[in-house]
Amino acid sequence: GTGLVGSEMCIRDRNRPDWCLSRQRAWGIPIPVFVNKKTGEPLRDKIVIDRIVSSFKKGGSDAWFEIPASNYLEPEYDANDFEQIQDIADVWFDSGSTHAFVLEDRDDLKSPANLYLEGSDQHRGWFHSSLLESVGSRGVAPFEGILTHGFVLDDKGRKMSKSLGNTVNPQDILRDYGADILRLWVAGSDYYEDLRIGPEIIKHHTDHYRRLRNTLRYLLGSLNGFQENEKIDYSDMPQLEKWLLHRVNEVNNSVREKIEGYNFHSIYTEIHNFCTIELSSFYFEIRKDLLYCGEPNSLERRGCRTALDILFNHLTAWLAPILCFTAEEAWQCYINDKENSIHLKTIPISVNNWNDEALNIKWKRIRFIRSLVLAEIEEARNNNLIKSSLQAKVEIKLSKEDKDLFENLIAADIFITSEVSFSIEKLETPKIKIDNADGNKCSRCWKILPEVKPEGLCNRCEDVVKIYCS
């Protein structure tokens, strides 16, 4: 991580042995030095050095071996008085000087670099040599930060080798699963440690990818035909949508912060959990009835679709650096404009007006009560009392404080049941009873309500059908 620049690397450099720069090899970058045979001192003369530089510019570094020493030394010196060094520089000296001939010589790059990125073995290699050379010649580090990662191992934590037969060819993953699955594995791996890869690990990430893709599919389906004039102001939105935008803000702030810290593994985990736990298993489930069966131009439905539009714009921006092809595919399905790529957008700026921690705390408690209700519904289903949650009537005994949470909310929609009744008792944890709902099943929304005639519609669905038929 970047913290090593100020701590561990300083300790290592302080305790390091002297660095011998010369190597006796047949090929490499020469050390262009002449040594006085009598005194053993290297020649320091700007005229000679300028000749060497000019020669290298014309013929490359091989000119040191190809051009006679007299061409560099005379007439100021007698070439017979000097030994021409034939050693080459340590290869780490070559790579360590990239800050000078890569960053400083190009107008489209800046020096020092924002980040140096390499494996953990480079603390004694490239990072080390770059730091020494830049500090020694420029007085500053060549980078603002460094990021190191572990090595790729097989799924059992072993180094890959042909003899073990445990190598993984990225091309095979690209062929069988696609590039986004491989990118998801990279983003989902904690690079502070060694990274493991194998068939089961790729399958695990494929399952996660499918959940993320299904989230995008739900959003695209729910936003079909959405127009700009359908949007409503935040102040007019239902309470649940205001909670959703609060959470979008929280995740957005977290994603931006983690990007700055190169904490991609945590970004992936947070987005995945948000999509599966808070969206797919909670918000999407609750709003299916409103989206599928609600009055098309109602304020509640418009508020829901406005929030989903905001969510889609944020989610595709979050996913674009990781699932670049999937994010672009979803984006084009929504806007249908080849000139307007998701990769031309940036992570949105958070909207302070959406922050509402009190509302978030309230909905955390509602979600807890909902989890208790769903557990009882599941038990009733296992006992063959009901077949689906819409067949259920829920009776809840709870404290007045908990009951007040549901004021101005349709509790049956939150629990995805047909009927809910509350009774107040002094309880820390609500008590829940499940029974069969009274009435007949609406053939459109499938809720069981007393008002429904056999094979008929509930009052809400009758009104909506009239709107569509008018």
Task: Show the residue positions of the predicted features.
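Positively charged, low-complexity/disordered segments
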Residues: T2-G6
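Structured secondary-structure scaffolds
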Residues: S7-E8, R12-G225, L244-R287, L291, ...
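Flanking scaffold residues of small Cys/His-coordinated metal-binding clusters
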Residues: I31, A437-N440, V452-K453
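Acidic, turn-prone loop/beta-hairpin segments
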Residues: V35, F82, F226-N253, F284-E376, ...
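A broadly conserved sequence feature marking short terminus-proximal activation segments
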Residues: T39-I52, R381-N383, Q391-N440
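Short Cys/His-rich "knuckle" micro-motifs
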Residues: Q84-D87, V452-L457, Y468-S470
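Structured, non-catalytic alpha/beta "coupling" segments that mediate domain-domain communication
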Residues: I202-E228, P321-C333, K393-L427
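Cys/His-rich metal-chelating microdomains
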Residues: I448-E451, C461-V464
